[in-house]
Amino acid sequence: MGVDPGASGGIAVLDEDGAVVECSNMPDTPMEILEFFRKYDANETVCVLEDVGQGMPGQSSSATAKFARHNGHLEMALLALGIKTVKCRPQKWEKTYALGSSGKHEKSEWKRMLKERAQQLFPQLGKKVTLKTCDALLIAEYCRKTNR
């Protein structure tokens, strides 16, 4: 399972063979987050949660606090359900896709590159690969390939 936290993120679940079980935009409320994760067996699920570590540069303190609260809801739901969770910095999982460095691209160009890579890896999803779900899919594949 790969989780790109934040309101504009997503969650993707792959089986051990890499088939997509579920791919969706980030649930809106803490209860919806809990219900999403509740569908999965804690003994058979590993979640890689992107460790952003801080708010986005230029965001207000209230936006940063909102992001931190949302991230806390994700962590608490995973903890409450006993789902093994591994945090991973974006630079680490992004490196495995050989796209270069995010710092060398405009944010919109970098997101487009990530979306294209997810579309290449998961062509069967078609339009379900969006800017909201592409990172989650790539994080889930990173999780699967590194046997987290």
Describe the residue ranges of each PLM region.
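Phosphate- and other anionic-substrate recognition elements at nucleic-acid/protein interfaces
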Residues: 1-148
